[in-house]
């Protein structure tokens, strides 16, 4: 399934050295849940190499649509399932690798009390008790949004939740909706909630209904600066980069050397 990016520390050093003499502008396509990890790692990468990075952020479905419409990208950070579909269409240049796992969490406005969600039943009751909630848009193939709607259906609360659910294009906007009082509770990937200082994020989520999602990183088949793109993808998989993930809400998934 995976075509491995295999880069030794020495080889990565050579890539960085080469990059300094021909800095490139790289376009990174990233899902919302991976945008903060990508930006955090990207800052260090730019400092080391002189490359400039810009980001296109969206749901897996939205990114797929833009890529299929012919938009240029150099590196893609997307769900494994989404990557599989893109790979079948030849949209990777033969290299993609497990990068991180993202998990679901809830958030309330900073200063408010988090509801009890210690069990599946407690989570269900918290959702029913909430005056309003926000999720990312299932219609845009948001992985968390699709999952949460299916979970409400499974719990038998789809109808009451429909009337008080505020849908946002991406999870980062879910956090904003909670912070500014549009919604009482936000439910999306933890990595999309944590960057917003206006919310308090749950440390846990009921294991019985948790749904970790694997994300991968790879070089786009439309990459204009292929060497620089490979260097960034490889850098994202290093132990140094993977160590940055937990503090910003995601679990490392790369096989670091």
Q: PLM features: what roles do these ranges have?
A:
Residues 6-17:
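Bacterial N-terminal signal peptides
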Residues 4, 22-71, 78-90, 94-102, ...:
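Exported/periplasmic ABC-transporter solute-binding proteins
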